[in-house]
């Protein structure tokens, strides 16, 4: 049986959608790690609680800036953690993952998201521009021949798109 996930990888938070179950996870995009050993100490809400409250060797960071990856390795580990947390122990087959990217990002930035998602354990990766994902999430049929203005306000970006099917 195939497992399909949708991930909104945001600057401020990550949402994970599991087909047939809906949104199963919403956590901050924060990772805490030991600067000396490079060992991850916490991810998500647990790491957010550590922001500004850690000893000098523990650093809590947000690995995305303005919707794009600023720390590839940390982002990969964060994606892997959230996928495993969303699916629990039932991960027999690698999931297919559709993951959002801001509109207007470069091909290099798109490739980084795709590679990090594959490295995190995906068997297939589909990149979806955030405004298109927002439209689908809002119940808009993007295949209908009518225009829609979509404004996506995120933690690190604001984007707008005019969607029109032909």
Regions found by a protein language model. Name each.
Residues 1-155, 163:
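Nucleotide/phosphate-binding catalytic cleft detector across ATP-hydrolyzing
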Residues 159:
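Positively charged, low-complexity, intrinsically disordered RNA-binding extensions
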């Amino acid at each position: 049986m195939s497992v399909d996930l949708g991930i909104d990888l945001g600057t401020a938070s990550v949402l994970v959608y599991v087909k047939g179950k809906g949104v199963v996870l919403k956590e901050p995009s924060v990772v805490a790690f030991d600067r000396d050993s490079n060992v991850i100490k916490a991810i998500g809400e647990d790491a957010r609680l550590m922001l500004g409250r850690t000893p000098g060797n523990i650093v809590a960071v947000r690995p995305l800036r303005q919707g794009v990856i600023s720390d590839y390795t940390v982002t990969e580990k964060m994606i892997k953690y959230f996928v495993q947390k969303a699916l629990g122990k039932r991960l027999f087959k690698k999931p297919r993952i559709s993951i959002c990217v801001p509109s207007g990002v470069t091909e290099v930035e798109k490739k980084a998201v795709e590679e990090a998602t594959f490295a995190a354990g995906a068997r297939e990766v589909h990149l979806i521009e955030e405004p298109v994902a927002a439209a689908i999430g809002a119940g808009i049929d993007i295949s209908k021949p009518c225009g829609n203005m979509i404004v996506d306000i995120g933690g690190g970006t604001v984007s707008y798109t005019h969607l029109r099917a032909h």
